[in-house]
Amino acid sequence: MAEGTSQRPLTPLSQAFLSTNTLSPASSPLTFHSEAASLRRKRSNFFPKLDELNGAQDEEMRGLNIPGGSGYLENRYGRDKFTFSDAAVNSAGMGGSGIFSHNNADDGLGDGSSTVLPSSLKQMLDPEISTANNPSAKPRRTRLQTAWKEATNSAGLSLRSASALDVLKNSGPATTSLLSSTTYPFDSLNAFNEPSHSHVPNSASSTALSRGMSNSVTLTAPPEPDEETIPTAIVIKNIPFSLKKEVLFKVFTALDIPRPYAFNYHFDNGVFRGLAFANFHSPEEAKTVVQVLNGYEITGRRLRVEWKRQLPPAERERVERGKQEKRAVEERKNQLKSPFSVANIGAGIDFDLNDPAILNVYSHILLFYYRSDNTNDLVFDSSTTQEERRVAALLASRLNLNHSVTGDGEAKQVVITMPSTHFTPANNSSANHSPLMAPNASTLNPSSLGASNLSQPSLANHLSSSGLFDNGLFSSGGLSSNFSSLRRPAPSMHLADSIRSLRGLNDSKAFSDIRSMPATPLELATPFANLNVSSPLDRNATNSSNTLNGSAMNDYFASLTPSNTGAIGSRTFTKN
């Protein structure tokens, strides 16, 4: 190795350490380079402001007037020993006359020792914080730290010095972005200057409070909820306009504070004005959030959290009345928009055709409408229940049948009669009457007639040969075209003429989806030869040969008896 390269010059830090302790250059294991002054001049381009620490004689010649020897470093660094308390430092430390031993120094805090850190150590961790216990001590920052801070600031980063709490809890890096106030909104609070804060917080709310705002900013405590406020509702003000609701809601999770079950932004004519409402399950949760979020800084704006105030009784009643009126208007709109069908026969009618009892009443009324005898009325006497009589009256009104209520109390009965004028099958129109039970020729098949082994032509031949159709209207030649006229179509359950004119003819298909209807003569499984079906044109005729005498219909009408009124040609409803 070349001569002069085996010795390395002492760095400024090494010289500072040696000058403040008992070690001397003679006893030091490090040898001094003879050309230290020239090397310092070469390094002056890299560390021009650190040359004053070397105390060379050539610096005095340049007019810096820096005293040489160890007295300069003693005066410069010796005063740090006054900032360390005797309880925290066991040796003389830097600037002291005693011998410093690494073996005697404690690496950590012992059991039962206080977590109050020395003020000088807190200054080293956070030079921006001034010491409250020693007003004469000012925050000092070395030139190297200043150079680092200037470099990081020019690069777009902010150098955040670790606080005492960060050292104890080992929380996160020291360098953050320019929006560090969003992640660490309370970095500057010196929470450990007071003895009352000597303990380490263990809850989220106390952690957020301990990392509070700087001492230069003082916020008043949020008011306690009173009788005019809602204890479980808060109002968050001064929210940044560009901050989304989802991002603000994540702040609750980041701070580990209770999250609201209802959280909404308030928009003024569609524009967000920095106001939000939050509701909580208990007053304790709301109080915790108010204490933590009040003064929380987000992108340079401090939130203001207050309790939500109740409206005056008169104003509250006016708002509630407006809500009820709006709800009533919406219900009326929905009723007008809803189509007329079996599910909603009427807005005030609450019966279900799937109910067996109601379906039985409906079947008897429908068979009464399709009667083949001279029965003029159908009576629902006192043997029926009140609900059945009510349903019978409602169904009769929907079927355009006349009904009347006679008697009082237990003897009350509902009498249903045919209207004075009703249509004739010859003038039948699908626009005015719903073909409830009248299938056309295309939908009538042998399987629906109970004769699965007969095709439609053979069925027509069988009906024509059995003498069922003696009228010229139902001749064998026009059987297929007039096949849908065998039965009288059911009346339509339509609304009044004034309302029906607005809806058009859509109600003609209102009850076309009903399949649970009683059997008719053509749908019985009995042999067709035993039936004697009359023409609907001769319904009012008195000829007894035109009546239905099928076995199934005879079984049905055999159980009918005259009504209590004694009128001839009436029948009474009986339960099956």
UniProtKB/Swiss-Prot annotation:
Disulfide bonds: none annotated. Interacts with csx1. Regulates global gene expression after oxidative stress. Interacts and stabilizes mRNAs and may regulate their transition between different cytoplasmic components after oxidative stress. InterPro entries: Nucleotide-bd_a/b_plait_sf, PIN4-like_RRM, R3H_Cip2, R3H_dom, R3H_dom_sf, RBD_domain_sf, RRM_dom, RRT5_SRSF_SR. It comes from Schizosaccharomyces pombe (strain 972 / ATCC 24843). This is RNA-binding post-transcriptional regulator cip2. GO terms for molecular function: mRNA binding. Residues 232-310 form the RRM domain. The keyword Repeat applies. GO terms for cellular component: cytoplasm; cytosol; nucleus; post-mRNA release spliceosomal complex. Pfam families: RRM_1. SUPFAM superfamilies: RNA-binding domain, RBD. It is found in: Cytoplasm. Residues 355-420 form the R3H domain. Keywords: Cytoplasm, Phosphoprotein, Repeat, RNA-binding.
